[in-house]
Amino acid sequence: MNPVPATCIRIERLSKTFRGQSTPALQAIDLAVAEGEFVALVGASGCGKSTLLRLIAGLEAPSEGQVCLDGRPVQGPGCDRAVVFQDYSLYPWLNVLENVRFCRSLRAHTRDASESEVNSAVERAYALLELMGLDEVRTRYPNQLSGGMRQRVAIARALMAQPRVLLMDEPFGALDAQTREVMHELILRLFEIERSTIVFVTHDVEEAVYLADRVVVLAPQPGRIDSIHPVALPPPGARHPDLKLAPEFLRQKKTVLDRIRATSGVQRDLDKLSRLAELSRRDRRPDAKPATGTH
């Protein structure tokens, strides 16, 4: 019997209301994320996915409740958490290697790191560049790279500090479909090697089910957890693109998508359109009686 993983992130009664807003962006969120777990957050626009990620990162302060990492309340950003955003956030004046090493180099300068620590950081940087397929472009600058390559640099930089938690906010949303699929395989390989705990925000249900151990559906206005879906598929490290065609994968994708539609009002709108289409078909029948008004 495998031991139960320890809880890495615990979110308790977490709420966030932004200044000038009457409706909370998030309300009464309770969630536990296990050590080494990959959790995806999905939901309609405005459900608070990115806000929840920023609260875990310590980039926003909660209005109520708390986020705990290893039992300690999150008070702000920390080296135990790294964030990858959709817009890459690379330093344009630094080349690939310098971008990857930046945060680790800054820490070394501020606390007078030993020679062995510096050497270890250099070795890790080169290892990450090789793992991410960046070793041949390490002297190039961000404006000389494709979107997919820039996101690889951002992920490598996030992993340099060996964070306990990797937070990813729509990291592949701006990439074309082919590049996104390549990045899926890359992130699964990294997850298997690094074993970081990952919280991943996406609007793509197929992406969420393919990558994650669990998918959390958030409902909007106010943002709250609607449902949590364990992914009953091979573990993330053993998944392959062909899995997306498997009946069980398609069933789980539909289950999550149905919940998003239900919470966002999309299904209600689709039902109205179906009713309108039926009325239109009926009115076009030869034997249909014209509608009459009351005077």
Language model regions located:
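Helix-to-loop junction immediately C-terminal to a conserved catalytic motif
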Residues: A57
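Conserved ABC ATPase "signature" region
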Residues: R101, S105-A108, A113-V137, R189
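Conserved ABC transporter NBD signature motif
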Residues: G65-P77
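The feature captures the beta-strand-to-loop junction immediately N-terminal to the Walker
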Residues: V42-A44
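Conserved ABC ATPase signature
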Residues: Y141-L145, M149
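A short, flexible loop at the N-terminus of ABC-type nucleotide-binding domains that lies
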Residues: N2-C8, K16-A28
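Hydrophobic anchor residue at the start of the ABC signature
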Residues: V84, I155
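A short, proline-enriched helix->beta-strand linker immediately N-terminal to the Walker B motif
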Residues: M160-R164
